[in-house]
Amino acid sequence: RICMAKEIEPKLQTIGAYLKKTDIFRIPEYQRAYSWNISNCDKLWQDIESYIDQDAEDPYFFGTIIIDCSMKGYLNLIDGQQRTTTFLLLLKAMHLRITEILNNMADTEEAAGLRRSLQQSLDSIFEILYRADVRKQIEIEKNWDKAKGVQIIENVSINELHKNELK
């Protein structure tokens, strides 16, 4: 028996709009486990850097993402799970690095503009990683226990469900 989607609805979105969805990204069990290595990640990073260097007016092309939205509260990633996972890991690394830079930055008038710009970037990343608006961000920063239950991506692959049997 083959189940077909009743409707395929393509949507062009920015990466920010895609990642800021409130539903949990879910990797179905029939999808392969995360397998990108440093070389794959480096290619993505180089592609992003090249886009930034071009100072292009068109949005960055993240690639085609296919999502099954039939499960309430979840976005089942049919295609694009490797890129999505890698991009979320990249955002977490950027969050850590920007936080470190801000903590070590001199609080001078000359650095004020850079500090504001970095803080805005950090706020945007925080909103994606912790599903938090500015008000909720302040609550989380005061009590990090409030971030413990936040889930962005769920991997229910066979490899994850039966990892003890794979030894």
What residues fall within each predicted segment?
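Glycine- and hydrophobic-rich flexible loops that cap the catalytic core of alpha/beta enzyme folds
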Residues: 4-167
